[in-house]
Structures are given as C-alpha cells and as structure tokens.
C-alpha cells in the first residue's frame, strides 16, 4: 500500500515573487482551475509575502488579496484555498477579509525562534473554523532539538500542521531529514516541508523530509518562487510517485497547467543564478534576492559580497533595510543626513 503525501501548491503566493506580484485575478483563476483539475487539494493564494503585504516595502500587487482569493475560489470545484499570514505584516482584519472571500485554510508564518508570535493568529483562526498550517521560517538557523521545541509551541496553540521551512534554500537533505525527525518526536500535529531550490536540492530535501515523517509538501508550478524558487510541483508529483508515494495528484494535467498556463506568464526562466546560489549558501532569506541585486548595481559592489556579509550578520526576514547599509559600507560610502533647506 502506497504511503500518502499531500502536495500543497504555492504558485499563486510564493510564485508571485517571480512575477513582481503581478498575476491578475484572471491569471489566478486560470492557474487555480488547472491545479484543481489535477487534484491538488490546497492552493495558496495571496501577495508573495502574504496578506497585507502589497506596499512600497514589498511591492504593490496587481490586485487586492480578497480579489485574488475570490478569483481562485470561483475557479475551483474541490480544492481548498489558503492564504499566508505573517504577524507584523498582516492583521486579523485582513485575515477576516480573506475568510469572507472564501479561504478555508490559513498558513501562519513566524521566524523559527519566535513561535510565540503565532499564538494569537493561530488561536483566532481555529476559533473561526479555519484549518491552520504554521511555518517555522528560516528553519536552518536552529538545530533540530531547539526547532522541535518551537514547533511544540505551535502544536500547543492548535496548529493542524507545522512546517519546517527552508526560507533561504540553505538546507541539504540531511538537514531537512534531521529537523523533520526531531519534530516528529515532539508534536502530534502533522508536519510539512517547504523547500527553496538555491542549492539545487529542493526535490531531494522534500523526499527526505517525507521519509522522516513529513506528510505535507509544498511546491510551485515551474518552480516559481522567491530567489531560486520552490520545489517544482509537477516534478514533486512525478518524483514522489516514482518513490512509491500516493500524492492523489494527476501528473499530466499538472504538467499541462505548468506548460501552457504558467510558462507563458513567466518573465524569465526560474534558475539558480549566482545571486540565488550565494543567497542559499550564505543562509539569507529569499526576499533579499531582488533588493540585493539592485543594491549591487547602485553601489558597484558584487551581490555575492553583500549576501555573504548579510549572512555573517545573521539577518532575517524583515531586515531588508540592512542591504543598503552593507552595500554602502562595502563600497566605502556612508549616508549623511541632508542639511535642512536654506542651511
């Protein structure tokens, strides 16, 4: 009897980062419809950084989160629509708007050392009838046992699934397996794994995570996602089937959606370029990818030098302002406060 694995697709959330958050509601509907026909049970939809993130800081989306959610909900027959909630970016009011638009699942994402930041949204979401998946972002930054202790907190708040999240694409299979195995000993909730492909091992990490107890695996069509992108949904489906797992997903409709719906919308192929590779090697959060490239060009400093220094400083998501500081320092420049007018 085949072992069961649940594939969650994040093309319409993490994949938004690959198109500067410019999928239209019609694009969302077309992609969601294809995923639903292929049997994908949960489809994540929102701005690339999550609910409430459309801003000058993270980039303005082509539509509102409720518009995206409604487009997906109206397009599917069976799949649940999910949204990402990051405390400090999203608000409960915005989560309520997403509920009103039709989400059935919320994914609450916290830094791997800050599980307590997820207590309020997790408990609120459970009270409002949602399935709750939780993310321990930048999971490579904690050893397995401390990570499991953080996971236990999320489990105690009522999370249905706790994810090991390789936000930087910094893990190799051993790292993924050890962390999932530690969680399996510490919590009763299901375990998920979210890969990024910066070191080229996203699929291998996902397979190893499953072998060690993960039952939910994230992917995105054509690998769309921040920096090097995510584990590729259609490849995940094929690889898991070859490895003897039951995904419940129909491979060829999935491939068709990737090939004929998603690929024409891509600005460029999703590849592991120099910046993406060094970002994973340095263990830097994936959202630093584009801002680092811009800073490198502005200050005439190699992007890899900026990323290696950011990695040495241990920056995390939300500290993107450090990119300019580091680039300026490396270029031998400093910013001065402009003198008041007329002085």
From Swiss-Prot:
Which residues are involved in binding Mn(2+)? 14, 194, 196
Which GO terms of the molecular function aspect are on file? Answer: 2-isopropylmalate synthase activity; 4-hydroxy-2-oxovalerate aldolase activity; manganese ion binding
- What PROSITE patterns does the entry give? PYR_CT (PS50991)
Q: Name one GO biological process term.
A: L-leucine biosynthetic process
What keywords tag this UniProt record?
Answer: Aromatic hydrocarbons catabolism, Lyase, Manganese, Metal-binding
Which residues of this protein are annotated with the site description Transition state stabilizer?
13
Q: What class of enzyme is it?
A: lyase
Which reaction is the catalytic activity of this chain? (S)-4-hydroxy-2-oxopentanoate = acetaldehyde + pyruvate
Q: Where is the Pyruvate carboxyltransferase domain?
A: 5-255
Residues annotated for substrate binding in this entry: 13-14, 167, 194, 285
Q: Name one Pfam family in it.
A: DmpG_comm
EC number(s) on record? 4.1.3.39
> By its UniProt entry, which PANTHER family does this protein fall under?
2-ISOPROPYLMALATE SYNTHASE 1, CHLOROPLASTIC-RELATED, HOMOCITRATE SYNTHASE-RELATED
Record's family? Belongs to the 4-hydroxy-2-oxovalerate aldolase family.
Q: What is the recorded name of this protein? A: 4-hydroxy-2-oxovalerate aldolase 2
The top of its lineage is: Bacteria, Bacillati, Actinomycetota, Actinomycetes, Mycobacteriales
């Amino acid at each position: 009897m085949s072992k069961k694995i649940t594939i969650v697709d994040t093309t319409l959330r993490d994949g938004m980062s690959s198109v500067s958050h410019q999928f239209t509601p019609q694009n969302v509907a077309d992609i969601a419809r294809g995923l639903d026909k292929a049997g994908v049970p949960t489809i994540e939809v929102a701005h690339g950084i999550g609910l409430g993130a459309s801003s000058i800081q993270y980039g303005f989306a082509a539509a509102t989160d409720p518009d995206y959610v409604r487009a997906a909900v109206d397009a599917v027959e069976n799949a649940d629509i999910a949204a990402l909630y990051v405390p400090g970016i999203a608000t409960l009011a915005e989560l309520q708007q997403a509920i009103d638009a039709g989400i059935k699942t919320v994914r609450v994402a916290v830094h791997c050392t800050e599980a307590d930041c997820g207590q309020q949204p997790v408990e609120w979401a459970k009270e409002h009838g949602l399935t709750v998946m939780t993310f321990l972002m930048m999971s490579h930054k904690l050893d397995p046992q401390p990570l499991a202790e953080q996971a236990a907190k999320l489990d105690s708040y009522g999370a249905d699934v706790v994810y090991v999240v390789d936000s930087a694409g910094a893990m190799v299979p051993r790292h993924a397996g050890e962390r999932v195995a530690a969680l399996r000993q510490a919590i009763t909730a299901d375990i998920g794994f979210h890969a990024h492909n910066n070191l080229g091992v996203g699929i291998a990490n996902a397979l190893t995570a499953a072998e060690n107890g993960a039952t939910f695996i994230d992917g995105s069509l054509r690998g769309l996602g921040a920096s090097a992108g995510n584990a590729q949904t259609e490849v995940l489906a094929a690889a898991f089937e070859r490895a003897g797992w039951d995904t419940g997903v129909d491979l060829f409709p999935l491939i068709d959606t990737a090939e004929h719906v998603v690929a024409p919308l891509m600005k460029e192929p999703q590849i592991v370029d120099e910046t993406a590779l060094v970002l994973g090697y340095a263990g830097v959060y994936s959202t630093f990818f584009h801002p680092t490239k811009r800073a490198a060009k502005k200050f005439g400093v190699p992007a890899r030098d900026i990323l290696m220094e950011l990695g040495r400083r241990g920056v995390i998501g939300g500290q993107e302002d450090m990119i300019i500081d580091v680039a300026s320092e490396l270029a031998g420049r400093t910013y001065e406060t402009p003198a008041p007018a007329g002085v």
